[in-house]
């Protein structure tokens, strides 16, 4: 790649705190030059006319900012792994409303005050900290023993003031333990020593375990090199992460050693798992090294580079952290904004118990259930599971998709079961509470129920209405659910009213380029979407999430595709997406894999798309690209 201006390597971290500022040494013009050369997205024209650093950096993402010399030293301390600092004891990230707590550190003031991951600090000492930025973060550090009063908005919308005592917090970011033949790696962040902890922990204990659980809940990230080293213990050699810069050039970060275990990893994840945690979790899925359970991760799929006096003549003790790359996990998918979708969606109150149930051994003396997930075998001792954690067992069975591969083992033999049969054998209802009452006769019932298990589609009163057409607004809602991406921004379209039920979905999809208007600044949200419109939108989604799709489109311009007879009835703007969905991926026999819900020959491009067709096509696309890994 052209730009290699690293000091610490690519950083994927939510830095914890920083301290008071000093005089600015960097001019707006110099900062603009840095951003022009390395910021991952094209800056708007208005950025050229910025009058201050604050105004200039408002045109970038939350992870791009300027640091004075004092702030830079605090930042360096915060990413070194096992560190000591005087602060409230929380890993944070910036959001428009203020400062979001990604995780609380053990022994810190935030933990003692009862703060939790997902809480948003909206004011510090009664002063608003919206939008979140380094200048607000500085107020959270101070001398040990002093206190700071913060106003916090909780996930349920309530807010309260907390007086938090700053303290020196020493955090060892990774611990490895073995209990009952199960290895448990608890990793709070990816620091300079994390890769070593993983490598030594797995190497030293693998002979004593039959399963590995890796707990990344609340892990806000850290160093990509540490995530790659940790992942390599399970995956072995290969390219484990890809960075793509503003020019579309990509480079891989590889692991060259052998894997240290043949046991699959069970990765625990939640909404506080971000950045390097997502590299690890996505890499486990992409390399077939295990599964991910819990809830969807945070969605920080961008990497930063650090400019300081060692690599930039504009800087003298101060620094600029710049989002310079989007990263793609080992399977070729980005986690940018969409996060990692778990193999099994398990409520957090059952996640650890579910992981331990999945860590069982094949038994001779009692009945067991063997699950084949992402190419790996997992055994559940049924009598022990029902006795120790019936709720977790039920949660696992509720999270499985209709096509799950299941075997019942008993008296030395095995037989294959359907999901409904497995539920009944375990003493639960054959159907899940997530199942729809009106899709049994749909040819796409399996795809619809699979999306429901992954919390991507939701019905109305237990019904899905498979034969109904979809409006443009409804399609945006479906895609927003799939990507877990919504936007409070407004102004993309004059006919998408702020406060309308579909505005967050439409605006989010417009912001990432999945949908566009109909002309005159309008979106026409209530118009029915056609097959070719949905093909176009779905193709853009695949391009957004998958690196291989981007490369395919670069090699297949419209000028080559438009003359093909098979696209005679298509509008020109739908052709590249149609080709991407039907002729870009090939199976082991060399046959094209169709990501859409029907063949090109069966498509009538201008007729409305049905809800069942949209769900099936979305499912096929997410499965083919590896966003969904079962």
Enumerate the predicted regions with their spans.
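Sec-dependent N-terminal signal peptides of Gram-positive bacterial secreted proteins and lipoproteins
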Residues: 2-25
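Feature responds to low-complexity, polar/acidic, surface-exposed segments characteristic
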Residues: 4-5, 409-445, 458-473, 480-505, ...
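PDZ/PDZ-like domain segments forming the peptide/carboxylate-binding groove
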Residues: 26, 83-131, 192
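Interdomain regulatory linker/hinge segments that flank or connect interaction modules
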Residues: 27-80, 149-151, 155
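PDZ/PDZ-like peptide-tail recognition elements
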Residues: 62-103, 163
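PDZ-domain C-terminal substructure recognizer with occasional recognition of PDZ-binding tails
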Residues: 100, 135-176, 323-324
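PDZ domains, with a preference for the canonical peptide-binding region formed by the helix
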Residues: 120-151, 199, 226, 301-311, ...
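C-terminal "post-core" interaction segments
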Residues: 177, 182-213, 217-433
């Amino acid at each position: 790649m052209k730009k290699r201006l690293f000091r610490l390597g690519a950083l994927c971290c939510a830095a914890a705190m920083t301290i008071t500022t000093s005089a600015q040494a960097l001019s707006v013009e110099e900062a603009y030059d840095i951003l022009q050369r390395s910021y991952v997205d094209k800056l708007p024209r208005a950025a050229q006319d910025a009058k201050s650093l604050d105004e200039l950096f408002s045109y970038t993402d939350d992870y791009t900012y300027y640091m004075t010399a004092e702030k830079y030293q605090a930042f360096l301390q915060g990413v070194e792994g096992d560190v000591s600092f005087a602060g409230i004891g929380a890993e944070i990230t910036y959001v428009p409303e203020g400062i979001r707590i990604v995780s609380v550190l053990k022994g810190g003031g935030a933990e003692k005050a009862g703060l939790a991951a997902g809480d948003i600090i909206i004011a510090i000492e009664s002063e608003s900290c919206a939008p979140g930025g380094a200048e607000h973060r500085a107020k959270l550090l101070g001398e040990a023993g002093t206190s700071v009063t913060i106003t916090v908005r909780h996930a349920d919308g309530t807010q309260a003031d907390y007086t938090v005592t700053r303290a020196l917090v020493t955090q060892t970011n990774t611990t490895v333990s073995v209990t009952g033949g199960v290895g448990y790696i608890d990793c709070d962040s990816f620091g300079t020593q994390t890769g070593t902890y993983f490598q030594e922990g797995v190497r030293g204990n693998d002979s004593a375990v039959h399963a590995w659980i890796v707990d990344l809940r609340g892990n806000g990230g850290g160093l990509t090199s540490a995530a790659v080293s940790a992942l390599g213990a399970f995956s072995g050699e290969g390219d484990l992460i890809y960075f793509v810069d503003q020019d579309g050039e990509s480079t891989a970060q590889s692991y060259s050693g052998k894997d240290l275990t043949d046991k699959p990893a069970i990765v625990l994840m939640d909404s506080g798992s971000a950045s390097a945690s997502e590299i690890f979790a996505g890499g486990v899925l992409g390399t077939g090294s295990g599964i991910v359970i819990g809830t969807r991760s945070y969605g920080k799929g961008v990497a930063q580079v650090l400019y300081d006096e060692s690599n930039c003549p504009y800087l003298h003790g101060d620094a600029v952290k710049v989002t310079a790359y989007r990263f793609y996990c080992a399977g070729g998918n980005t986690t940018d904004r969409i996060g990692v979708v778990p193999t099994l969606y398990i409520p957090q109150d059952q996640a650890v118990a579910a992981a331990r149930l999945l860590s069982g051994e094949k038994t001779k003396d009692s009945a067991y259930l063997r699950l084949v997930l992402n190419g790996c075998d997992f055994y559940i001792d049924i009598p022990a599971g029902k006795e120790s954690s019936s709720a977790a067992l039920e949660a696992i069975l509720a999270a499985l998709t209709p096509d799950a591969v299941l075997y019942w083992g008993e008296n030395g033999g095995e037989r294959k079961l359907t999901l409904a049969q497995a539920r009944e054998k375990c003493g639960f209802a054959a159907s899940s509470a997530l199942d729809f009452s009106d899709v049994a006769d749909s040819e796409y019932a399996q795809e619809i129920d699979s999306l429901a298990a992954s919390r991507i589609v939701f019905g109305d009163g237990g019904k899905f209405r498979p034969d109904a057409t979809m409006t443009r607004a409804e399609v945006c809602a479906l895609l927003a659910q799939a990507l877990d991406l919504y936007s409070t921004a407004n102004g993309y379209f004059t006919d998408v009213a702020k406060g309308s039920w579909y505005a967050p979905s439409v605006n989010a999809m417009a912001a990432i380029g999945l949908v566009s208007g109909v002309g005159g600044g309008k979106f026409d949200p209530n118009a029915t979407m056609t097959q070719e419109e949905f093909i176009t939108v779905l193709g853009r989604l695949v391009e957004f999430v998958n690196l291989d799709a981007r490369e395919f489109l670069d090699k297949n311009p419209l000028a080559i595709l438009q003359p093909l007879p098979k696209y005679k009835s298509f509008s020109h703007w739908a052709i590249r997406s149609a080709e991407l969905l039907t002729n870009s991926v090939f199976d082991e026999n060399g046959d094209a894999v169709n990501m859409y819900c029907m063949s090109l020959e069966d498509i009538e491009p201008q007729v409305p798309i049905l809800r069942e067709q949209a769900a099936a096509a979305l499912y096929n696309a997410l499965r083919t690209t590896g966003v969904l890994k079962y």
